[in-house]
């Protein structure tokens, strides 16, 4: 176990992991409008470990060619000293080396060294000078570092063996689009968190994935993120380009300012107007912008009321009471076409109405109005009148006629059924034997009642009215009752 543990300690000492021994508080980053970003890291490590650290961050070991690239790297170095406080010179790994098959060339600016990437850059003659001339060789592989005097001012290139340790390294990242830095306005405590695992207090340009957090007035936190879409890059959840709106009217260098601080040394106006304001005629004051401002009288917007449905009640509408209206008169309601329509008085639920019927004359001119949905609405100008009789609409008339017809048909059917019942009763043969059995045995039957009975039957058979035959039968029965049975006078 002890040999293995000692071997692990030796391996960590000779081959530290990527990012080991770094100082995040001293690291810095910057981006240019071309889409290139650079980061400076303070960490003691070898050349290969520096390359791996840049790859893990999403970039590569940086080149420092002439032109904009050189200026961006110099700006990072001059932004502040490293962890040592600027007491000594610092060495930073870059992507500059000389391969085994290449020789040292004293007459060339890079002395036979070359950049690992083939990206086009500036002229090699515009590069930095060499602090020390490299050794002449055509067989050994050599690396180069960027030496910074006091950790701030770049001195130039220096040859260094690749297995030795430097004080830091430079990484480069390339993006297609970048977000311009948002103006802070009234924001404070700004913090940029770049996608290559680096925090910064300010970035002129931010790659997609950068998150900016700050505090607005009242210690309200705000956070926005740079995102890329089909159009380009923009800040998500940010309306405009100011993080926190200013309470005043002036902005200077993207921050809120007062009017006395807007004048430069020469007396010129050095501020810009905040959102909602525009520069006045004097060229120094910001006045309220007229765009989007309401008028003094206000704008009357008609309110749409939803149509009444089976599940929603009819919206109530209250009309203002006019002084010139008399009690009992019908109020007048203005329509959309500036015409006046009278509304009849409707008694409320549970109240006693003095009007037995509502008499209205339908002397109206129907006006067809086509709504946007395609339906036709008819309008009637109706007036109330007490002299004209009440009129029924078509539906009420149809119902009345139908009910009357049904009653008449029912009466006719009832009369017919009663007549048939009576007719069947008189034609029944059971009445003849009952009359013959009324006389005592041994007596002869009276011919006159028989004649009367025959005449009654004859009356029925001859089609005489049932009512007349009935009266005649009753008269004959009365005569039979007055005469005694078995009398000779009968």
Swiss-Prot record:
SMART domains recorded: CLECT
CDD domains tied to this protein: CLECT_thrombomodulin_like (cd03600)
A cellular component annotation (GO) from this entry: collagen-containing extracellular matrix
Superkingdom classification of source: Eukaryota
Protein name: C-type lectin domain family 14 member A
Record localization: Membrane
Chain's gene name: CLEC14A
Any one Gene Ontology BP term: vascular endothelial growth factor receptor-2 signaling pathway
Entries under InterPro entries matching the protein: C-type_lectin-like, C-type_lectin-like/link_sf, C-type_lectin_domain, CTDL_fold
Residues annotated as domain EGF-like: 245-287
Disulfide bonds: 143-162
Residues with attached carbohydrate: 189, 381
Cytoplasmic side: 419-490
Topological relation to the membrane, as annotated: Single-pass type I membrane protein
Annotated transmembrane regions: 398-418
Keywords in alphabetical order: Disulfide bond, EGF-like domain, Glycoprotein, Lectin, Membrane, Signal, Transmembrane, Transmembrane helix
Extracellular side: 22-397
Signal peptide as annotated in the record: 1-21
Location of region: Disordered: 286-349, 428-461
SUPFAM superfamilies membership: C-type lectin-like, EGF/Laminin
């Amino acid at each position: 176990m002890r040999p293995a543990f000692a071997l692990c300690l030796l391996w960590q000492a000779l081959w530290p992991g990527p990012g080991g021994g770094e100082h995040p508080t001293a690291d810095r980053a910057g981006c240019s409008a071309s889409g290139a970003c650079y980061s400076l890291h303070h960490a003691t490590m070898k050349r290969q470990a520096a390359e791996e650290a840049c790859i893990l961050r999403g970039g590569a070991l940086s080149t420092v060619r002439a032109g904009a690239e050189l200026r961006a790297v110099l700006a990072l170095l001059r932004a502040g000293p490293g962890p040592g406080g600027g007491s000594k010179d610092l060495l930073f790994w870059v992507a500059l080396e000389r391969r085994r098959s290449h020789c040292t060339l004293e007459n060339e600016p890079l002395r036979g060294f070359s950049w690992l990437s083939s990206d086009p850059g500036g002229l090699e003659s515009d590069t930095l000078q060499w602090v020390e001339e490299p050794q002449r060789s055509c067989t050994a592989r050599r690396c180069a570092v960027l030496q910074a005097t006091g950790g701030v001012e770049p001195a130039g290139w220096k040859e260094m063996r690749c297995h030795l340790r430097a004080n830091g390294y430079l990484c480069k990242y390339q993006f297609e689009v970048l977000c311009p830095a948002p103006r802070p306005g009234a924001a404070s405590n700004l913090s940029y968190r770049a996608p290559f695992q680096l925090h910064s207090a300010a970035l002129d340009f931010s790659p997609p994935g950068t998150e900016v957090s700050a505090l607005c007035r009242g210690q309200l936190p705000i956070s926005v993120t740079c995102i890329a879409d089909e159009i380009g890059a923009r800040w998500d959840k940010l309306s405009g380009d100011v993080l926190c709106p200013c309470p005043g009217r002036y902005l200077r260098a993207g921050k809120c300012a007062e009017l006395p601080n807007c004048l430069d040394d020469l007396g010129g106006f050095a501020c810009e107007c905040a959102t909602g304001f525009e520069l006045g005629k004097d060229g120094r004051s910001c006045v309220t912008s007229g765009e989007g401002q309401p008028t003094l009288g206000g704008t009357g917007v008609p309110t749409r009321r939803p149509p009444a449905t089976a599940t929603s009640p009819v919206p109530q509408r209250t009309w203002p009471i006019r002084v010139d209206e008399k009690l009992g008169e019908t109020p007048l309601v203005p329509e959309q076409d500036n015409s006046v329509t009278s509304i009849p008085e409707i008694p409320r639920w549970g109240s006693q109405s003095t009007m037995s019927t509502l008499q209205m004359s339908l002397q109206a001119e129907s006006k067809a109005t086509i709504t946007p949905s395609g339906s036709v609405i008819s309008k009637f100008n109706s007036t109330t009148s007490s002299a004209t009789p009440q009129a029924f609409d078509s539906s009420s008339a149809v119902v009345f006629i139908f009910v009357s017809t049904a009653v008449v048909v029912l009466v006719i059917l009832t009369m017919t059924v009663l007549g048939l019942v009576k007719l069947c009763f008189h034609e029944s043969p059971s009445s003849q034997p009952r009359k013959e059995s009324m006389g005592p045995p041994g007596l002869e039957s009276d011919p006159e009642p028989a004649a009367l009975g025959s005449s009654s039957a004859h009356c029925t058979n001859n089609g005489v009215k049932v009512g007349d035959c009935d009266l005649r039968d009753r008269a004959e029965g009365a005569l039979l009752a007055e005469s005694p049975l078995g009398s000779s006078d009968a």
